[in-house]
Each structure stands twice: as structure tokens, then as C-alpha cells.
């Protein structure tokens, strides 16, 4: 699996240390093991997880601005866990409302010795925003409209929303409230992944 991960990273133009690669593989192995009992993801094959979960998450890393992020609706830690491994200088709050997912995240934190994550069981609307975050990240969590509506209190004055999407979400962009603007949309290159992937970056308009 290490060889496959190395080839995928090379294709994506991402350089990681051996320690980071081993952490990513350890996470995939834990996800595969716990998935049998906890049903954390529909992806069953660890090699497929490398593409659809690991690479699909970490290709976003170069676009994240700041050091304090919250991954809303993180599920089994996607994209937050892979991002925390490739961005060890940043801190990631991993938010999910389901206890079994948060228990898994805490076990990952313990076994991988990840000191830059904080798994939290909470609904996003009820989660406090102090201090505010540099970035609010979501992967398959909600529509853009729901994301900014439910998470409006989380980013700081210069903070951004980072939404990982499949095809270009033109309809969702058109429905954004006028107090928000799309700063940019990046077409992502995810090696060996069928279908398009986009990162939508949103900021609140200055009043």
C-alpha cells in the first residue's frame, strides 16, 4: 500500500515524509478495521480508500489559508484527519454529531499520536465560535447555502468557507445569500479518481 500511495502522491505533485505516509496508511488500516463494525464509509477496499478518501482530501491542503480550521460533518475524519497529517503546523477541530464517529476519531488521535486535532461531538449550529476559525471545511456535508447558514458564526473576519464538491456546483453558487461571495473555484486533480472534483472558497462580504 505504501508503494501505491507514493505513486499517487507523485502523480498529484505532493511531497510527504515517510512518517506522514505511514500515518496516512495507519489511518486507512484503522478505517478499514473499524468500518466492519461501525459502518463509517461505503468504501470497503483499503486501496480504494487511498484514492477516494486520502488523496481526495489532501489535494486541498495547498489552498488552506491560516492555522485554525474546523471540519464540519467530518464523519470518520474526512478531510480533517488526512489534512492534519499533511499540515502538522495547523490545528483541526473535527465536528460530528454521531458518537460512534467521534469515538473512532479519538482512537485515531490516540494511536497516531495526532496532537493537532480535537474531535468534538456536537451539532454545528450549537458549537461555539470563540475563538473564531480561519477556515470552515466541508466535504459532502451540505449545500453551499446550508453550509454558510449553519456555520456563519464560525469563521473569523478574514476566515473562509472551503467546500469540497464533485461537479462544478453552479446551481448552489447561484443560490448563495448576497452577503457571501465566491472568492474562487479550483478544479482539483485527484489521481485515479473518476469524475470531477472542485474546491469552492467563499468569504463573507464586508459590510
Curated annotation (Swiss-Prot):
UniProt entry tagged with the keyword Transferase: yes
GO MF terms, alphabetically ordered: rRNA (guanine-N7-)-methyltransferase activity
Principal subcellular localization: cytoplasm
EC number of this enzyme: 2.1.1.170
SUPFAM superfamilies (alphabetical): S-adenosyl-L-methionine-dependent methyltransferases (SSF53335)
Keywords attached to this entry: Cytoplasm, Methyltransferase, rRNA processing, S-adenosyl-L-methionine, Transferase
Localization terms from the record: Cytoplasm
Keyword Repressor: no
Reaction equation(s) it catalyzes: guanosine(527) in 16S rRNA + S-adenosyl-L-methionine = N(7)-methylguanosine(527) in 16S rRNA + S-adenosyl-L-homocysteine
Sites where the protein binds S-adenosyl-L-methionine: 73, 78, 124-125, 139
InterPro entries per UniProt: rRNA_ssu_MeTfrase_G, SAM-dependent_MTases_sf
Pfam families: GidB
Function: Specifically methylates the N7 position of guanine in position 527 of 16S rRNA.
Protein known as: Ribosomal RNA small subunit methyltransferase G
The encoding gene: rsmG
